[in-house]
Regions:
Chain B
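Membrane-embedded alpha-helical bundles that constitute the cytochrome b-like, heme-associated redox core
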Residues: 1-112
């Protein structure tokens, strides 16, 4: 059995990487490695996970320089030889070790009006949305976000402009802009326009490249750019 | 700046970029043809002086540059230097005026 040489970030933002040696196994995930360190080597290691099957979005970390969901990332796919470097997500404050404070990430989703605003009441009939309609298909394309923060950590524009809403918040806004039942389209387009919103995106597509759910926040942001332009030309912003 | 204002600036930058894509291509083709055709400076001026077409073309070119370049510099100032707000906006507006004035003077010099 070979051994993995693992560097793991310890401490807060002014911390440093510490070396660990972890037995290597077949089909071993990066989360398995972190869990081994915490349970067998150093119980003070702080990290976050929940479902372990790629549903909850809790376990994202920086692995060999790139943000990834660690529960669905096999060591064999990302290790350089027998070496791994595991750190907290970028663009977020480090609480301790591999745990980041994701408050700003979720706050930005609210700033982008990422909450559904119903137009119907419980006494109304169900809304009938045709599955093949263009709006429904556009909403479908963006709807499976698990809020892992990988796109946010990968985004260069977030690093340059901390006010930028980021790919996940804009992706969520695009889902709701295409939701025909929603009643806050105009407010939402105003919330996502501007130099902290969709118009700041440089279309590097790093978010799309890194998204573990294979979504395209870049396409969602392009959609928001189009809709905000039409809204501006109609005087609705 | 308001969402409406920022969106309008974005529209201005993207629209000016489309204009520049055409203008730069035409300009480069014109320069290449002029150089390979062996035209002297006097020959070129003979064709441009009094030409409303060349005056309009390069006038539009200058206008697009004076819109596009300051907006790009504004973004660079914001993202790379952290300069945001009224100061950089005013500086970029002055750059726009300067580019427009210098460009139109150059157009006037070869077309009037």
């Amino acid at each position: 059995m070979s051994t993995l040489e693992v560097k793991v970030w310890r401490g807060r933002a002014d911390g440093a990487y510490r070396d660990y040696r972890v037995p290597r196994h077949d089909a071993q995930t990066v989360l398995d490695v972190v869990t081994h360190i915490q349970r067998r080597i150093d119980p003070t290691l702080a990290y976050r996970f929940a479902c372990r099957v790629g549903m909850c979005g809790s376990c994202a970390m920086t692995v060999n320089g790139k943000p990834r969901w660690t529960c669905r990332t096999h060591v064999a796919k990302v290790a350089r030889g027998d070496r791994l470097e595991i750190g907290p997500l970028a663009n977020l404050p480090v609480v301790r070790d591999l745990v980041t404070d994701m408050s700003i990430f979720f706050d930005k989703s609210m700033r982008a009006k990422g909450r559904f605003e119903p137009t119907a009441t419980r006494t109304d009939d169900f809304a009938r949305v045709q599955p093949a309609s263009a709006a429904r298909r556009a909403a479908d394309a963006a709807i499976e976000c698990i809020g892992c923060g990988v796109c946010y950590a990968a985004c260069e524009v977030v690093a340059w402009n901390p006010d930028y809403l980021g790919p996940a918040a804009l992706n969520r806004a695009w889902t709701l802009v295409n939701d025909v039942r929603d009643g806050a389209r105009r407010e939402r387009l105003s919330a996502v326009a501007g130099d902290a919103g969709c118009h700041a995106c440089h279309t590097h597509e790093t978010c799309t490249e890194r998204c573990p759910k294979k979504l395209s926040p870049t396409a969602a942001i392009a959609g928001l750019k189009r809709e905000t332009v039409w809204a501006a030309l109609r005087g609705e912003l | 700046m308001s969402a409406r204002g920022e969106t309008r600036l974005w529209i201005a930058q993207r629209t000016s970029a489309m204009v520049l894509a055409i203008c730069v291509a035409v300009h480069l083709a014109t320069m290449t043809i002029a150089v390979h055709g062996g035209l002297s400076a006097a020959d070129i001026l003979g064709r441009t002086r009094g030409s409303a077409t060349w005056a309009a073309f390069y006038g539009i070119f200058v206008l697009a540059v004076s819109i596009h370049a300051p907006l790009g510099l504004r973004t660079v100032a914001s993202e790379w230097c952290g300069w945001r707000g009224a100061g950089p906006d005013a500086a970029c507006a002055m750059i726009a005026v300067a580019l427009l004035a210098l460009g139109l003077l150059a157009v006037a010099a070869v077309t009037l």
